[in-house]
Design a protein with these regions (language model features):
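Acyl-donor binding region in acyl/amide transferases
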Residues: 80-140
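Generic recognition of long tandem-repeat/solenoid scaffolds
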Residues: 4, 87, 150-152
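Short glycine-aromatic motifs
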Residues: 2, 55-56, 137-147
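Conserved catalytic-core motifs of GNAT/GCN5-like acyltransferases
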Residues: 144-156
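Conserved donor-binding loop and adjoining core beta-sheet/short helix segment
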Residues: 55-98
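Flexible, charged surface loops at secondary-structure boundaries
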Residues: 51-54, 64, 117-120
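Short amphipathic alpha-helix that is part of the acyltransferase structural core
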Residues: 1-41
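Active-site rim helix/loop that mediates acceptor-substrate recognition in acyltransferases
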Residues: 33-56
Length: 156
């Protein structure tokens, strides 16, 4: 079951989590362009956001075994003032069979969407370069009312 990690846990295990996030940030073309080959500053920023006792806008989630790491961030639109939860990064650290993967996706959705509602978010955004996540989202349409949109990145 996916659990929100405490700031203390993040501080004590940051080096381990940082390695997993680096892997996630460089594992696909889109994330690699935005976060790969950059300075270490991105990880300092994330660490500071996750451990700031005065702000709880960024969150790190994990299963007890560390099989999955999910990084989320609350965003507020400058235009509409609506709050949403961005699933910034999600990665698994071990290979699992397809049934387990689908079950974990369902459990993660239940846990994170409950958290988003508690934070007064009006929705959740998830970007992915992986067709698999779009296919999973499509399969949940009946019970999540997911709206699948397209996003484009033109590297400059």
């Amino acid at each position: 079951m996916l659990k929100l990690l405490s700031q203390e846990d993040i501080k004590n295990n940051w080096n381990e989590y940082k390695v997993i996030l680096k892997k996630a940030f460089t594992s696909s073309e889109g994330t690699h362009i935005l976060t790969g080959e950059g300075s270490e500053n991105i990880y300092k920023v994330i660490y500071n956001k996750l451990t700031n006792p005065f702000s709880h806008d960024m969150h790190l989630w994990s299963e007890g075994e560390g099989d999955y790491i999910v990084l989320t961030q609350i965003q507020v639109s400058d235009i509409t003032d609506k709050q949403t939860l961005l699933l910034f990064s999600a990665t698994r650290t071990k290979e699992v069979d397809k049934d387990t993967l689908t079950e974990r996706y369902y459990e993660a959705y239940q846990t994170i969407s409950k958290f988003a509602r508690e934070q007064n978010c009006e929705g959740m955004y998830c970007y992915s370069d992986l067709d698999y996540f779009a296919e999973l989202a499509e399969q949940t349409k009946e019970w999540t009312n997911v709206i699948i949109r397209y996003q484009f990145l033109f590297p400059l």
